[in-house]
Amino acid sequence: MKKYISFIIAFALLICTVAVSVSSAEGNEYWPTNENVRIIGRYSVSGDAVNVGYGLTELNFNVKAESVTCTISTEQEAPAAPYFAVYVNGKLTKKFKVNKGEAEYTLASGLSSNKTTNIRLVKTNERWMIAKIGKITVAGGEIAAPSKAKGKLIEVIGDSISAAYGILATDTETEDDVTTDATYGYAKILADKMGADVNLVAESGKGIYCNYNGEAGKTMPAIYDKNPDGTAYSHTAEPDVIIVNLGTNDVYGMGVNKEITKDNITAAAKEFIAKLREVHQNSYIVWTYGLMNSDMTSVIEEAVSSFSEDGRISFIPLPAQSEFSDGVGKSSHPDITANKATADYLFEKLINNGIIGSGMPGYLETSVDAAWDYDSSKMLGDANNDYDIDICDLVRMNEHSENSDIKIDDGNADYNSDGKIDSDDIALLRKQLLKN
């Protein structure tokens, strides 16, 4: 399967944008402030630039223009170069590497200044592959009013599994920077299913008490209060659900450092849960763990159970990844199939455990869609007209077509041209959207 999607791209939240524009011969120039650009995920501001690192960190804005370019810089280079995916009106149009130094990158061209076009610039790989996003130049037009946020936010905290390490790899020789792509990971898929934005805080090798190499320090709890560049993070965004997926690297770390005990890890897990509750008093906290090993299951269960009086903290163990997929990504990490199955598994558990329900956009009932009017004049497949293509659009198209007499434009929703909108269209649409 991976051979067909090795160059695919596939989802958090603080809001930031471009309030000031400067006209030039090339077009109107904008800088990230706080008006017309939504920034989803963790970031820091340095002068006029926005520093981003974690996968799924996203700049989301609308333009009425002919083309859009953006100045991006980095001190990194292959095999640790930052990569970005660009979505135009919800459709993946390119994935590109940021070269060392500063350069101007074309995000979109051939647009119409008479129409609103949504642009999403999404970071795909690891935290330490940091880039600075600066000037946005809009030629033949201007930045328009932003699209509204999805209204729900999940935060996913984890290691390489959550960062989607090596998910696009076809062999062990492929470089990490291009094959690590969180847009295909379970965190993004789960957020789409929930109709939520996602704030991904995941880095390969990180553990609860110790990292993959046995180092007891610089773990995920130790860096949780920081932005990718090491500056302090404010925690002002309040997630509806926090999902912690840690413990896998502690197993490997214990194998390297024999002085580390499960008691050390249990204590660290309890401290981290207490920290999460301190900074996010209203979030539901879910610890999930499994896929690559299960040795820490009892440790996590003990840590979570110690907060039973909280009433909004739970543990969801995951099956081995072999139950989800026959294949693997790089270094035996979960592949795309396993990530999709993990998202489906967690989504079902979240519903069955009463953690999410009819109040979540991704959990739709007929009544929710009663007033929804399908507009085929909008972008391909954007059923809810939010300039984004996600599972909510697919569910809405499928449900509405089965329960009404409206005619669906086969150029907009009937992707396999069989005269009906069903799960086959959903599968094909998702596949086509992810293809590069």
Label each PLM-derived region with a short phrase.
Residues V198-E203, W287-T288, G357-Y363:
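Surface-exposed patches in mature extracellular/periplasmic domains of secreted proteins
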Residues Y4-S23:
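Sec-dependent N-terminal signal peptides of Gram-positive bacterial secreted proteins and lipoproteins
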Residues A19-S24, P361-N436:
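Cellulosome-associated attachment modules in secreted, modular CAZymes
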Residues L56, R127-W128, I167, T172-K258, ...:
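Conserved SGNH/GDSL esterase-like catalytic core that processes O-acyl groups on lipids
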Residues S160, I189-D197, V201, F272-V279, ...:
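Structured segments of extracytoplasmic/periplasmic soluble domains
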Residues N89, A222-G357:
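Alpha-helical cap/lid subdomain in secreted, periplasmic
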Residues V22-I157, S162-T179, G359-A371:
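N-terminal secretory targeting modules
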